[in-house]
């Protein structure tokens, strides 16, 4: 009987702590402004700068999903973590690359094909800063991410448009976190990032639609590399946006023979119109981009990360 009471008390205590954690998360989401004061916290094991002056960006083949690993010297960053079924595979792959810690991990928005494996990432790596938009979801996938953050005692950072931070030599600017607080489409709440390294810049669009793209047209968005928004769907990559960005390269993260028909001919036609060289994970597997000075090179490997 005593053991039963202890177990009940333990369960109640765990539930109370979990409920308290969700209150803390809610206060952070409602309050905002947490990002700027806590960002750029140094990695616990951060060492010397990038001696090779070379940045590596892995567009990891996770099928119809996104996961991007950035290695800048001894500092690591992850943007998205694929679907729920990709988590353990991503952990294994990233560990094979020698990754143990992320200075930044970003869940661009609360859709399963972007944060599905993030709970596994949080549980298996040291996360110094976790970035996510203010807009939340009631999905089990999103709850799993919050539970993992709770378990590891990592408080999320809620970025605002215009926020800036650095990895090692690479600098980042938050270009968008949504059109308004009333956004109903989670895609449009994507954390859109501009990365600058030496003489090269890259745009990471998440799943942002043409509506978000239109809001960016008056900003400094001309970049050599574009991570094409929303897997190359017809809802992103408008003619005016591609014309303004003027990318030399477009990376499309997409699953082979996916049911959505991504990338669409509309998107491919626009990219072709502006002479954008396209790299696709469904055709090339994991794509590794190397940046050194103003030189950009690509190689691809069949990682089978998506099973």
Regions found by a protein language model. Give the residues of each.
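Non-globular, low-confidence helical/coil segments that flank catalytic cores
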Residues: 2-307
């Amino acid at each position: 009987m005593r053991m039963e009471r202890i177990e009940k008390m333990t369960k109640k205590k765990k539930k109370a702590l979990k409920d308290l954690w969700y209150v803390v998360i809610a206060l952070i989401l409602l309050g905002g402004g947490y990002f700027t004061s806590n960002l750029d916290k140094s990695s616990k094991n951060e060492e010397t700068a990038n001696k090779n002056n070379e940045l590596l960006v892995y567009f990891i083949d996770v099928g119809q999903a996104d996961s991007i690993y950035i290695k800048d010297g001894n500092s690591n960053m992850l943007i998205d973590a694929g679907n729920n079924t990709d988590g353990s595979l991503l952990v294994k792959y990233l560990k094979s690359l020698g990754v143990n810690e992320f200075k930044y991990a970003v869940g661009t928005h609360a859709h399963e094909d972007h944060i599905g494996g993030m709970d596994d990432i949080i549980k298996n790596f040291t996360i110094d800063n976790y970035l996510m938009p203010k807009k939340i979801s009631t999905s089990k996938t999103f709850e799993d991410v919050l539970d993992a953050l709770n378990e590891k005692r990592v408080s999320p950072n809620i970025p605002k448009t215009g926020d800036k931070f650095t990895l090692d030599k690479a600098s980042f600017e938050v270009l968008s976190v949504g059109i308004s607080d009333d956004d109903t489409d989670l895609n449009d709440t994507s954390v859109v990032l501009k990365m600058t390294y030496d003489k090269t810049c890259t745009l990471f669009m998440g799943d942002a639609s043409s509506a978000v793209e239109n809001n960016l047209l008056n900003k400094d968005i001309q970049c050599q590399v574009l991570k094409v928004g929303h897997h190359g769907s017809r809802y992103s990559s408008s003619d005016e946006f591609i014309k303004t960005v003027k990318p030399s390269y477009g990376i499309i993260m997409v699953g082979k023979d996916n049911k959505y028909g991504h990338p669409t001919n509309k998107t491919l036609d626009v990219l072709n119109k502006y002479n954008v060289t396209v790299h696709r994970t469904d055709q090339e597997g994991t794509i590794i981009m190397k940046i050194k000075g103003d030189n950009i090179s690509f190689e691809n490997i069949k990682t089978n990360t998506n099973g």
